[in-house]
Amino acid sequence: MVEINNQRKAFLDMLAWSEGTDNGRQKTRNHGYDVIVGGELFTDYSDHPRKLVTLNPKLKSTGAGRYQLLSRWWDAYRKQLGLKDFSPKSQDAVALQQIKERGALPMIDRGDIRQAIDRCSNIWASLPGAGYGQFEHKADSLIAKFKEAGGTVREIDV
């Protein structure tokens, strides 16, 4: 499993804020780990909730958990990582694996957050440039949340 250091924790917290699961407005009993897309909560962490939610006539989703993981991706990563449940620890493990597969972990570790966000934009619909037709946050807002969560951003001399 991929290690969680302070930089990675801050990036995960930023993602949860961006995805709307742990933003101070969405109801949650567990920092967003219990949120189904659309706002409903779940309590059974033995497996992904697998609830198909119609968000609008053109958009349906099975997104669930802190990082709004789709059930089809949960099935693949559960097997790949040997996960036993959909617990917070398992949700973090999947998110970190997805970030790793995009080559963004070293960027996060050294503070190149804008580049890491760009690398991960095809995974999370709320990131700038995702192109899923959903609301996308601005990079500056995401970087501010990353810093607020305790992350350090590498300053680039211009």
UniProtKB/Swiss-Prot annotation:
Record's catalysed reaction(s) = Endolytic cleavage of the (1->4)-beta-glycosidic linkage between N-acetylmuramic acid (MurNAc) and N-acetylglucosamine (GlcNAc) residues in peptidoglycan with concomitant formation of a 1,6-anhydrobond in the MurNAc residue
Which BP terms from GO are recorded? defense response to bacterium; peptidoglycan catabolic process; viral release from host cell by cytolysis
Outcome (variant: residue 48 to N): 97% loss of lytic activity
Q: What is its EC number?
A: 4.2.2.n2
Q: Which residues form the active site?
A: 19
Report if keyword Lyase is assigned: yes
Spell out the subcellular localization from the entry: Host cytoplasm
Q: How does activity depend on pH?
A: Optimum pH is 6.6.
Q: Which GO terms describe its molecular function?
A: lysozyme activity; peptidoglycan lytic transglycosylase activity
Q: Which InterPro entries match?
A: Endolysin_lambda_type, Lysozyme-like_dom_sf
Q: How is its activity regulated?
A: Inactivated by zinc.
Q: Which keywords has UniProt assigned to this entry? A: Antimicrobial, Bacteriolytic enzyme, Cytolysis, Host cell lysis by virus, Host cytoplasm, Lyase, Viral release from host cell
What function does the entry list? Endolysin with transglycosylase activity that degrades host peptidoglycans and participates with the holin and spanin proteins in the sequential events which lead to the programmed host cell lysis releasing the mature viral particles. Once the holin has permeabilized the host cell membrane, the endolysin can reach the periplasm and break down the peptidoglycan layer.
Assembly mode:
Monomer.
Name recorded for this polypeptide: Endolysin
Naturally occurring in which organism (per UniProt): Escherichia phage lambda (Bacteriophage lambda)
